[in-house]
Amino acid sequence: MKKLLLLPLLLVTYFCLSQDAKAIIGKPITIGNLLVAQNDFPKQMKWQDAKKACENLGRGWRLPTKDELHILYQNYVKIGFYSNNFYWSSTEFVFESAWVQYFGNGGQLYINKSETSYVRAIRAF
């Protein structure tokens, strides 16, 4: 009986996750050998949450590296990525820090992973 009650809950959870993934990914933009999600996640996140959120999109979606984020900055017009925000990269600086890209001027710096920044997922193809 418990299994029968659990099944609808799992289906609702899957539907909500897949709808969220569709909203984030949208129509991906191609930059070189990368697919870039059309939209940011709706809120800023800590680094570990950002990594997990990208991976939870499935199908190889992930947080971009520091160098990949810089490529996105260089192509912000093509992507339609007009932002004055900081975005997480997957590149760690030291155990407690990771690199972010500032899309206001292209600068990169490292911040503590407990801080929050915006997130844009990518995947290679």
What are these regions (language model features)?
Residues 4-12:
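Sec-dependent N-terminal signal peptides
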Residues 11, 57, 75-79:
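Alpha-helix boundary/capping residues
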Residues 11-19:
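Short hydrophobic alpha-helical membrane-anchoring segments
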Residues 18-61, 97-100, 104, 112, ...:
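Extracellular adhesion/carbohydrate-recognition regions
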Residues 66-125:
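C-terminal, surface-exposed recognition/capping segments
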